[in-house]
Swiss-Prot record:
UniProt GO MF annotations: mRNA binding; poly(A) binding
CDD domains, per database record: KH-I_KHDRBS2
Source organism: Danio rerio
Name used for this protein in its record: KH domain-containing, RNA-binding, signal transduction-associated protein 2
Domain KH: 65-131
Pfam families: KH-I_KHDC4-BBP (PF22675), Qua1 (PF16274), Sam68-YY (PF16568)
Residue ranges of the region described as Disordered: 175-291
Biased composition (Low complexity): 195-224
GO CC annotations, alphabetized: nucleus
Annotated localization: Nucleus
Function: RNA-binding protein that plays a role in the regulation of alternative splicing.
GO BP of this protein: mRNA processing; regulation of alternative mRNA splicing, via spliceosome
């Protein structure tokens, strides 16, 4: 049937009919409206009106072409599916649409694909078409078109022929995790004890400076160490300098800079008490100490940790004996204009 001649014939037939032919006039009017509104699809299916008042579910389907002809060496099917098909599953859950990879090259076994294509069955007819992604949505009109729009935007990201994009890197990490090569215990041991640094300091004793914290902004001093009475360690960038009670800086004296080395605490022969504490300290506690940059270094000192009462008393006596060498704090000056007592004496 010639579509160009069909519409003029319908109009001419409607004009020639008598008004008594009510049903014939109605059918001709409906047929003319279909062609005038250009609502006839290429496949012959007539487009119906969209009813949004009843909010009934409608079915939408779109076929997205995969650019295998422009990029024949790129594996689009593998990128769309992901490790064990997880990428496609997550994409369907996020968009609320059903997706299927159809067409020539959609099956891994090429021999079986060719056999099924030649079988002539209706369900394998798509193997004769180009490689594409079929997106289907079944929902109320407003939600259906919203899901379809979201699905088209997400599927577009997977059709970029890039081996180093964010989607590809995430799939490689997921694949390594599924294969068992990513062991969480290795990362914990590496960050827990293997990254602790110390300086070339003298053996541990009363009044010695605490080992410096690992490098980084906002790093805190290790727990269980005794602060120095003679010099204050240089704080890290972004951390306030710790101050001890009753001490004053010596004029003209600068504390020597401590250079960090890659030796661990075990190289200096620390006693078992300190080693046991670092062994028991878990990976989470280190993260809490290093992530809190707003606290000062002095808040992490624990004076007298691991020592008995006798050693603590000796340390207090030594500190009191060295007290006369320091200047006494100046007393607050009072104004002479005020009386000693607010009320008069009787």
């Amino acid at each position: 049937m010639d579509q160009d001649k069909y519409l003029p014939e319908l109009v001419a037939e409607k004009e020639s009919l008598d008004a008594s032919f009510v049903h014939a006039m109605r059918l001709l009017a409906e047929e003319i409206e279909k062609f005038e509104g250009d609502e006839l699809r290429k496949d012959g299916e007539v487009k119906k009106y969209l009813d949004i008042i009843s909010n009934k579910n409608i079915k939408l389907s779109e076929r997205v072409l995969i650019p295998v002809q422009q990029y024949p060496k790129f594996n689009f099917v593998g990128k769309l599916l992901g490790p064990r098909g997880n990428s496609m599953k997550r994409l369907q859950e996020e968009t609320g649409a059903k997706m299927s990879i159809l067409g020539k090259g959609s099956m891994r076994d090429k021999g079986k694909e060719e056999e099924l294509r030649k079988s002539g069955e209706a369900k394998y007819a798509h193997l004769s078409n180009d490689l594409h992604v079929l997106i289907e949505v079944f929902a109320p009109p407003g939600e259906a078109y919203s899901r379809m729009s979201h699905a088209l935007e997400e599927i577009k990201k997977f059709l970029v022929p890039d081996y180093n994009d964010e989607i590809r890197q995430e799939q490689l990490r997921e694949l390594s995790y599924l294969n068992g090569s990513d062991d969480p215990s290795r990362g914990r041991s590496a960050r827990g004890r293997g990254l602790r640094l110390t300086s070339t300091a003298s053996p541990r004793g009363r009044g010695s400076a605490a080992p410096p914290a690992p490098p980084g902004r906002g790093a805190a001093a290790p727990r269980g160490t005794v602060s120095s009475r003679t010099s204050v360690p240089t704080p890290a960038r972004g951390v306030s300098a710790p101050r001890t009670r009753g001490t004053a800086g010596t004029p003209g004296y600068r504390a020597p800079s401590l250079q960090a080395t890659h030796k661990t605490y075990e190289d200096y022969g620390y006693d078992d008490g300190y080693d046991g504490e670092y062994d028991d300290q878990s990976y989470e506690s280190y993260d809490d100490n290093y992530s809190n940059q707003s606290k000062s270094v002095s808040e992490y000192y624990e004076y007298g940790h691991g020592n008995n009462d006798e050693n603590y008393n000796n340390y207090e006596e030594d500190w009191i004996s060295s007290r006369p060498n320091l200047k006494a704090p100046a007393s607050r000056l009072t104004r002479g204009g005020y009386r000693d007592h607010p009320y008069g004496r009787y």
